[in-house]
Amino acid sequence: MNKPMLMLITFATSLLAQTNKASTGLKTDQSFNNSLSESVKLKEIADIYPTNTNFLTGIGIVAGLAGKGDSIKQKDLIIKILEENNIINEIGSNNIESKNIALVNVSLQVKGNTIKGSKHKACVASILDSKDLTNGILLKTNLKNKEGEIIAIASGITQPNNKLKGSGYTIDSVIINENQNINHSYNIILKKGNYTLINRIHKILTSKKINNKIKSDSTIEIEAKNISLLEEIENIKIETNPKILIDKKNGIILASENAKIGTFTFSIEKDNQNIFLSKNNKTTIQVNSMKLNEFILKNSNNLSNKELIQIIQAAQKINKLNGELILEEIDGNQN
């Protein structure tokens, strides 16, 4: 029976060394090579978000509801809102009495700074007893911040918000008309928390004289006053932990250059195909500290891939493996 193919990746030279290639025609997808890379761009392992969020709200009127609007019970309140928004002259009393308009709450959440002239989507919700706001027209509505300052103007056609259950609606045309106090703080948030990695990023940022503060195992707060600095931070190269990928089914081992195995003794029962020898031939193996790639190359002629994988997994269990062990099945049909 042919021995399964053994593949080693050495990233120092960016070459793929293959042994026993003739035994299988298995191909590995480039994504596996990339996933084992020890040097990645920050944007591949983290996202950058503004630290501040602005909440803007306002009360407005949706017109053109053709009998599906608010009842006349709240006529006085509706008139008051129309006066506050300086649109009382645009709405006749007939529209109120014929249930053609509705009193609504308009809310907008802006992550990051509110920039004059920028356009946003807002949520619209009925306040009183209107039945349906679909295809209504939101008249000009002032949106204010928590200090009561008018920051944006909302208007446009209301559409059902399919992402929300219930009676939520949206409009696409909210225009910011005032800049608020500009905030230059952002959070770098790792996709997977790791104190070692977060401290490594902190040291790199500090060496580049970028103000930063570790907030948790997954978050660093930074100060960036321009887009070019954010772009530079996104593309910073980060050295990640060494990785070892094992495909037990196909007998494949992929190891990044700096993955290492420590010193320990391992006892294994070798399966002999010779019927005249004992079927359970126990062998003791002395493993010396070295790079994992070197260990595999040194022992590939004497040990099967299955046995090598057993040793690597044993090393990981007793903390003698320097590298993150990943168990995955590689699809050999990919090109």
UniProtKB/Swiss-Prot annotation:
The alphabetized UniProt keywords are:
Bacterial flagellum, Periplasm, Signal
Q: Which residues form the signal peptide?
A: 1-17
What are the subcellular locations of this protein?
Periplasm; Bacterial flagellum basal body
What are the GO BP annotations of this UniProt entry?
A: bacterial-type flagellum-dependent cell motility
Q: Which Pfam families does the record match to this protein?
A: FlgI (PF02119)
Q: What is its main location?
A: periplasm
- What InterPro entries does this protein map onto? Flag_FlgI (IPR001782)
Q: Please give an example of a GO cellular component term from this record.
A: bacterial-type flagellum basal body, distal rod, P ring
From the UniProt record, which GO molecular function terms apply?
A: structural molecule activity
Subunit info here reads:
The basal body constitutes a major portion of the flagellar organelle and consists of four rings (L,P,S, and M) mounted on a central rod.
Family the UniProt entry places it in = Belongs to the FlgI family.
Function noted in UniProt: Assembles around the rod to form the L-ring and probably protects the motor/basal body from shearing forces during rotation.
Quote the protein name from its UniProt record: Flagellar P-ring protein
Q: What is the lineage of its organism?
A: Bacteria, Pseudomonadati, Spirochaetota, Spirochaetia, Spirochaetales
